[in-house]
């Protein structure tokens, strides 16, 4: 009995520690990019996956102690996919006492009509979903739209664009929407996916599977995700350093003439950002810059979330 109580206390301690880390990550992202302001009404896009559940939970937690006042409204888009458990999210949100709206739109039918069998439907589905969410934000009077993309998503997008698109472009933590009317924020931008997985598992969120539409996952993104996971396992700190690099760009040492005036460099020009160090012996730190291992990182092997069995 004492052993059980000891394990329970340890689990609660670890959960509290994990929640504090996620809360700190979200708080830093909000502050760095001015994501939330006084009086904001945040539309939290809730898909039923681990990321959006975690985002809602951490924002609710921050709402209680933040120095500014803001409100939350959770929104789920029921796309009429076969087997979608439409009772799960309303029951969960009512239990929490969170304001919410379920938007019912048969985008599944539209996608099936337009896309040949066996082809990836994600692109069209995403465009349809985006338009509906923008419209819903206007109807609800939301000042910001919050999406659940995390640090790993941002890095994956960067490498996808580098490897397949020939450009250095990631996923912005804050942006103006396609229609020019809404500000979109990603509060989980600094959060690690493995932290989100552990948190969702500990909180026992009622996870809804994301493949009810039958669409195949993006193979290119999967390749990138596997590569980054392998690097994270074999070279601790590399992921953190790469993400830091996204926040520490030196345009004068790249090759984009739109970002730096290379043609304007003439005799007498000032040295910019250290000049040319290509022939110097660089001092590379033994540990990745700015990386500190977390105490509980050794327990992160092969974590998976159970999802609700849809009958």
UniProtKB/Swiss-Prot annotation:
Cofactor(s) required for function per UniProt: Mg(2+); [4Fe-4S] cluster
Annotated GO CC locations: cytoplasm
Protein's pathway: tRNA modification
Enzyme nomenclature, EC number: 2.8.1.-
Cofactor note: Binds 1 [4Fe-4S] cluster per subunit. The cluster is chelated by three Cys residues, the fourth Fe has a free coordination site that may bind a sulfur atom transferred from the persulfide of IscS.
Superkingdom of the source species: Bacteria
GO biological process terms on file: tRNA thio-modification
Positions that bind [4Fe-4S] cluster: 122, 125, 213
Main enzyme class: transferase
Keyword Transferase: yes
UniProt subcellular location: Cytoplasm
Short name of one Pfam family: ATP_bind_3
Keyword tags: 4Fe-4S, ATP-binding, Cytoplasm, Iron, Iron-sulfur, Magnesium, Metal-binding, Nucleotide-binding, RNA-binding, Transferase, tRNA processing, tRNA-binding
GO function terms (MF aspect): 4 iron, 4 sulfur cluster binding; ATP binding; magnesium ion binding; sulfurtransferase activity; tRNA binding
Swiss-Prot/TrEMBL catalytic activity: cytidine(32) in tRNA + S-sulfanyl-L-cysteinyl-[cysteine desulfurase] + AH2 + ATP = 2-thiocytidine(32) in tRNA + L-cysteinyl-[cysteine desulfurase] + A + AMP + diphosphate + H(+)
Renumbered ranges of motif PP-loop motif: 47-52
Other remarks on this protein: The thiolation reaction likely consists of two steps: a first activation step by ATP to form an adenylated intermediate of the target base of tRNA, and a second nucleophilic substitution step of the sulfur (S) atom supplied by the hydrosulfide attached to the Fe-S cluster.
Family: Belongs to the TtcA family.
Function field: Catalyzes the ATP-dependent 2-thiolation of cytidine in position 32 of tRNA, to form 2-thiocytidine (s(2)C32). The sulfur atoms are provided by the cysteine/cysteine desulfurase (IscS) system.
Subunit architecture: Homodimer.
Name by which UniProt lists this protein: tRNA-cytidine(32) 2-sulfurtransferase
Source organism of this protein record: Salmonella schwarzengrund (strain CVM19633)
Gene name linked to the record: ttcA
């Amino acid at each position: 009995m004492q052993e059980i109580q000891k394990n329970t206390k340890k689990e609660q301690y670890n959960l509290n520690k994990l929640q504090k880390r996620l809360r700190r990550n979200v708080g830093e992202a909000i502050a760095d990019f001015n994501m939330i302001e006084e009086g904001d009404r945040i539309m939290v896009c809730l898909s039923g996956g681990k990321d959006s559940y975690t985002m809602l939970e951490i924002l609710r937690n921050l709402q209680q102690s933040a120095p500014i006042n803001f409100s939350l409204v959770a929104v789920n888009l029921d796309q009429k996919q076969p087997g979608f458990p439409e009772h799960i999210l309303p029951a969960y949100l009512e239990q929490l006492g969170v304001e919410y709206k379920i938007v019912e739109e048969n985008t599944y039918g539209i996608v099936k009509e337009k896309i040949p069998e066996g082809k990836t439907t994600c692109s069209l589905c995403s465009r349809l979903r985006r338009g509906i969410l923008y419209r819903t934000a206007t109807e609800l009077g939301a000042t910001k739209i919050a999406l659940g993309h995390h640090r790993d998503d941002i890095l994956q997008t960067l490498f996808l664009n580098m490897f397949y698109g020939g450009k250095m472009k990631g996923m912005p933590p804050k942006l103006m929407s396609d229609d020019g009317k809404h500000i979109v924020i990603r509060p989980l931008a600094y959060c690690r996916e493995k932290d989100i997985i552990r948190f969702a598992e500990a909180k026992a969120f009622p996870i809804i599977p994301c493949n009810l539409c039958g669409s195949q996952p993006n193979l290119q993104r999967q390749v990138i995700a596997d590569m980054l996971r392998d690097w994270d396992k074999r070279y601790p700190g590399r992921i953190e350093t790469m993400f830091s690099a996204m926040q520490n760009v030196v345009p004068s040492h790249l090759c984009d003439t739109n970002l730096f005036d290379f043609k304007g460099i003439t005799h007498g020009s000032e040295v910019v950002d250290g000049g040319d160090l290509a022939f110097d012996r660089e001092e590379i730190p033994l540990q990745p810059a700015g990386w500190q291992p977390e105490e509980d990182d050794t327990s992160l092997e092969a974590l998976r979330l159970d999802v609700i069995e849809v009958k």
